[in-house]
From Swiss-Prot:
Record's protein name: UPF0435 protein YfkK
UniProt keyword Nucleotidyltransferase present: no
PTM-bearing positions, type Phosphoserine: 57
Domain of life (superkingdom): Bacteria
Pfam families: DUF1128 (PF06569)
InterPro entries noted in UniProt: UPF0435
Taxonomic placement: Bacteria, Bacillati, Bacillota, Bacilli, Bacillales
Length: 71
């Protein structure tokens, strides 16, 4: 059974991936992030969900931030 934090992480990652139209969504999984990073991921999620569109450099920066938050 998954924890509420894992479910929250999964939902946020899926929403970020959809918003950014990431083609390789399977590469980013909730299991790759520790519960300790949920606050940082929540901040990133809020920022992504507020914007309508992203420049290529913004998308790259977001992808790099996601990578830095991984375990």
């Amino acid at each position: 059974m998954s924890s509420p934090n894992t479910e929250t992480l999964t939902q946020m990652i899926e929403e970020i991936s959809q918003k950014l139209n990431m083609l390789n969504v399977g590469v980013i999984k909730a299991e790759d992030f520790s519960d300790e990073k949920i606050e940082d991921l929540t901040y990133l999620h809020r920022m992504v969900m507020k914007k309508e569109s992203f420049s290529p450099s913004e998308m790259q920066a977001i992808a790099q931030e996601l990578a830095s938050l991984r375990k």
